[in-house]
Amino acid sequence: MQQILNDIAAEMALETDRGKVADYIPQLAHVDPNQFGIAVATPDGQVYVAGDASTLFSIQSISKVFTLTIGLGKLGDAIWTHVGREPSGDPFNSITVLEFESGRPRNPFINAGAIAVVDAIMMGHEPKETLGEILRFVHFIADDDSIRFDHKVAASEMDHRDRNAALAHFMKSFGHIKHDVDKVLGVYFHQCAIAMSCEQLARAGLFLVSNGVNQHTGIRVINAQQSRRINSLMMMCGHYDGAGEFAYRVGLPGKSGVGGGILTIAPGKGSIAVWSPGLDHVGNSKLGSKALELLVQKTGWSVFSN
């Protein structure tokens, strides 16, 4: 595995078309696009890394996997009264489908859906309490208490919140948001601003490799059925309106973020985190997607392989 990752990192270093760094969040626009990291964590406790795998980056929408997990843990199937389970086929911040579906988001991995999940898990608590719960959960699944919010990124997103605020207010007008919109958005922007490295992120994804069990502690995070269902949602909805292309080329459940990270799960085999800040036209890491396609070709880890 280490040689495979070394070879992939070397190949990515030669790529000239690295995509475009997200510029609508000013703090992300300053990130050096010439970076690439990859890490694979396996259920036996091994972690293999290559490239800039220890560099911290903003996980952005990858955090939606973690808040959905918290929501399933707290509410069970009742979480699905707040959000659907269907691919949207639209950009992650689109308001179009919301209008047709009476303000109920299509899935928890588009912005509107993730905001609805945050509202659901707040359960009357103040933002500070909910943020503490989210960060403690990430510490637990990654087995790393050093992970923190990047408050500068969160503030940058809050300053440019107009589209997300519109989504939240639209949902609230239909009764799908119960808390104060600014409080919900404050939590949402901070969860997206969690800073992690590829190594930390790969460790954090291991519970989805092992039917919901935290491999660091042996403690169950969610039940096996919930773990399978999160993976299925990652496969269908995890890459914005590029989910079909990712399934076609990589064939694994994954969740991307506009910070350039992708968390990918090979059930029973490994948790893969890749990061390169340059994005393709739908907002997924350009080199990250290429690297994962190479990894699957070299390992045969696609869920569609015999």
From Swiss-Prot:
Substrate binds at residues 61, 111, 157, 164, 188, 240, 258. Keywords: Hydrolase. Its EC number is 3.5.1.2. The keyword Hydrolase applies. One of its GO terms (molecular function) is glutaminase activity. It catalyses: L-glutamine + H2O = L-glutamate + NH4(+). It comes from the Bacteria. GO terms for biological process: glutamate biosynthetic process; glutamine catabolic process. It is an enzyme of class 3 (hydrolase). Pfam families: Glutaminase (PF04960). Homotetramer. Belongs to the glutaminase family. This is Glutaminase.
